[in-house]
From Swiss-Prot:
Stored InterPro entries: bL21-like, bL21-like_sf, Ribosomal_bL21, Ribosomal_bL21_CS
GO BP annotations listed: translation
The keyword Transport is annotated on this UniProt entry: no
Classification via PANTHER family: 50S RIBOSOMAL PROTEIN L21, LARGE RIBOSOMAL SUBUNIT PROTEIN BL21M
Family annotation (NCBIfam families): L21
GO cellular component: cytoplasm; ribonucleoprotein complex; ribosome
Keyword Membrane assigned: no
Similarity comment: family membership: Belongs to the bacterial ribosomal protein bL21 family.
Name of this protein: Large ribosomal subunit protein bL21
GO terms, molecular function: rRNA binding; structural constituent of ribosome
Record's function text: This protein binds to 23S rRNA in the presence of protein L20.
Amino acid sequence: MYAIIKTGGKQYKVAEGDSVFVEKLDAAEGSEVTFDEVILVANGDDVKVGTPLVDGAKVTAKVEKQGKEKKVVTFKYKPKKHSHSKYGHRQPYTKVTVEKIEA
């Protein structure tokens, strides 16, 4: 059984027991989160596709970790002008483990 959920502007294919890195959620480590925006639920040959969401479906997951990705460095320069700038960015993420898919 698997489902496609929508969170943080992205879509993820998840199954029970899967660990997924999603955009930062406002939840403490060890707490449970519920994803109500379920686009598709498949259980063998039984496939439910939402229009746009599946009614009554939800995915329950446990927050494993809050963290930041590796740093992405951006460097801009203008030749012959002695002008340059260097920026760094670390995107925050939340690692969740899917516990239950209800449809």
